[in-house]
Structure formats: C-alpha cells, structure tokens
Amino acid sequence: MQVNETLAEGLRHEFQVSIPAAEIAAKADERLDDLKDKVKINGFRPGKVPVSHLKKLYGRSVMVETIEDTIRDTNMQIVNDRGLKLAGNPKVTMPSEPKEIEDILAGNSDLSYSVAIEVVPPIELADFKSFTIEKPVVDVSDADVDEAVERIAEQNRTYTTRAEGAKAENGDRITISFKGTIDGELFEGGSSEDILVVLGSNALIPGFEEQLVGAGVGETRTVKASFPGNYADSELAGKDAEFETTVSLIEAPEELKIDDEFAKLLGLEELDQLRQVVREQLSAEFARAMRQHVKRALFDRLDETHKFDAPPTLVEEEFEQVWKTIMAEMEKEKKTFADENTTEEEARAEYRRIADRRVRLSLVLSEIGEKNGITVADDEINRALISRARQTPGREKEIWDYYQRNPQALAQIRAPLFENKVVDFILELATITEKSVTREDLFKEHEAHSAEM
C-alpha cells in the first residue's frame, strides 16, 4: 500500500492512496471462503461449494464490499498513523472513468483513490484553577410564594352566571364569538367562536376588551382595534381591524379564598403544604436559572481562553442547523429581518459567529472529557431515556425503541449528560463567587444569552 500526502493546508489534508490488486483479491477470496460455510446452493453440500463457483455467483458484490471496507480501514489507518483527529467523515474520490472502475472490480488494476479529510486542531487546555466564575444567588421570598399562590388561585377561580339583564363589568368572564375584517375583508385567524375572555386581563389586542364592558348577553358590538406594531404576525402588525362581536354569556368572579379548603381542592392537606410545594417549585426554577447563568459564564471563559480555528465543515453544519431553525421560526411568525431591526446579511454573520463558538466549545468540552476520563455510563443514559419516555404517557415503549434503533438520537440524550459532567469537573477546580441579584435580573440575563449556550 502506498500513501502520499498531496495537501496539508490548515486543517485540511489530502492523500493519494494505491492498494495492490493482489491485496484486494486476497481479501475478497477470504470473504468468499467464509461465505461458503453460510450459503446454501442446490447441488452442493454445506461448506463444500467451490470458491470458483461462489466467485461466479457473488464475486462482484463481494469485491464491492471488500473495496468499501478496505477504503474505510485504510482511511482510519492514515488518520491513526499520523495522530490526527477527524472532524468529519473522509471524502473519497474514486476514478471517474467507468473502465478504470471495471478493471478494479475485476481485479485487473490496483485500487487507487484520493481522500480529503478535515481534522480537529490540537487544543491546549487552560488552567481551570485560574477561573473565577460569578454565581447569581436568588432566595425564594415569602412575596414570591404569595404571588405564585395567588396566580394558582386566579387560574382556579370559579365564576357564576350573572342574572338576566346584567351588563359585563371588568373582571367578568364573558363568552364571545367574533368575525374580524380589515378594510372590509375577512382575514385569516380573525374569526373565532365561543371563546372565554376575562375583561381586563389584556388577553386580546389593545382596546378590544374595553369596548365590551357594559355589553349584555345577546348583544353584538362592532369592536374597532389596532394590531400592535410588534404583533407576531407581521402581515397584521400595525393594521386597523373591526370585529363584529357577540356576547353569549356573562359570568361574575367568585371571591378568591386562599385557605386550607382551597389547598384541599388541589389535593393537598392544608395551605401551609401548598405554600411549601410552591416554595420548592420556585427554588428548583431559580436553581435551574442560576445553573444556566453559571454555565454561560463558564462557557464565556472557555471561549476567551481557547481561541483556535474550528473545522470549517463542522461550523458550516452547525450554522445550517441553526439557520434552518431561525428561518422556520420567522416563517411561522411571518416575520422579516426588518422586523428584528437587522438584515439577512447581518443575521447570517451573527449566527455564523454563534455556530463557530458552539463548535469550539464542543471540541473543548470533548477534549477535557477525554483527557480527564469523563464518561457517561449506560445506566445514566438509560435513566435519562426513561425520563424522556415518561413525558409521553402511553408511548413509552415506542419512544424507548426509537432511541435504541437510532444511535444519532441516542447521542442527543448522552450529549447534555456529558456536558454537565464536564462543567461540574471544571467548576470543582474554579473559584465560585456569589452575588445576590433580583429574580427579575436573573431571568432577564438568562433570556438575553440563551442563544449562545
């Protein structure tokens, strides 16, 4: 076998490979010899089929398989012998002339091909003991608990039908049907039947609910309102509309009583238990947000201290995946780049930067895990998979089987487990400082930087 490197430019390497025809033929004969013990052919006893006869029947397909396996094994040998780390699958170029291919398959010519590979650059890891990471700290206050309990109570508020002839007031729940028009024409999504609206909740576009205060059951009003300039559907944003709206039911809110009886309606023993459950839920919610903040701060430090050229192919793949998601969201919400105060060119540049960062961080985390023996055990993956399957009651086995059949999907279960293990490893070495922040600041920061995680 001859291997000549024809290009070594940055992270790209190309090789010209030549493997003697005799070597390929010997491997193919080994396959055929192994095959004779497995196939059943009329007129021959098991294991007694002559190789020459097998070659007539299966010679071409066996040669194709032999060549494919030889190319794969040779490419891995090239990579391993040079201490390289692949960034993606090798790209093989075979001879273009049909006669050359036929000669190789017939065993009359050496197997010659070229292979291009892209590699991961050497990564020199930072001293994680020098890292200082700030952790925001938010304690669950009694006011937070009160607010959450009141929200739960509001969601479970009961209503009673108002007396005949009553007029709708703020706070009432009304049932309405409407047909919306713009410039006299019906528009998509502008009509609805029998929807519940609490007057004053601002669930509908600005100005809509106010015009129904004072309406009675059976009354139809023409509601004039404008869609906000930042409305999700850009085709409706900023436009004036009219809605022929009919009220079919008016219900008055009953008094909210947040007491032991209310807690029992929710399946709990008393109000104190409800408050404790809410406090624990808020604590878990805050902890997740604080964890995300710490991870982002850590990733920022890893980004700052590990500057290298990421493999272009990996960056392009990550960018295409991100961009596809962005475009799908924009199409769904009928938004344009102008709606986001940017241009497509600027957006592409920003998301390509994010893709480059994600790829570099992924490679750094992988290097840290490899050098420090950080792994994810099968039972950890299985527990995560069971948890995922339980999110779709009744389809647990279907979900489980899907992941077992799809290694790439299973890798998506493993990835966050591995990432969290590496993050915990670094945080054990780093210095963590705490800073008290408000709940609002914690979640505002979390939302602002979620795209780069």
Swiss-Prot record:
Gene Ontology cellular-component terms listed: cytoplasm
UniProt gene name: tig
InterPro entries: PPIase_dom_sf, PPIase_FKBP_dom, Trig_fac, Trigger_fac_C, Trigger_fac_C_sf, Trigger_fac_ribosome-bd_bac, Trigger_fac_ribosome-bd_sf, Trigger_fact/SurA_dom_sf
Entry annotated with the keyword Calcium: no
Family the UniProt entry places it in: Belongs to the FKBP-type PPIase family. Tig subfamily.
Role of this protein: Involved in protein export. Acts as a chaperone by maintaining the newly synthesized protein in an open conformation. Functions as a peptidyl-prolyl cis-trans isomerase.
A Pfam family annotated for this UniProt entry: Trigger_N
An annotated Gene Ontology molecular function: protein folding chaperone
Catalytic reaction annotation: [protein]-peptidylproline (omega=180) = [protein]-peptidylproline (omega=0)
Protein name per Swiss-Prot or TrEMBL: Trigger factor
HAMAP family (UniProt xref): Trigger_factor_Tig
EC number(s) from the headed UniProt entry: 5.2.1.8
GO terms, biological process: 'de novo' cotranslational protein folding; cell division; chaperone-mediated protein folding; protein transport; protein unfolding
Superkingdom field: Bacteria
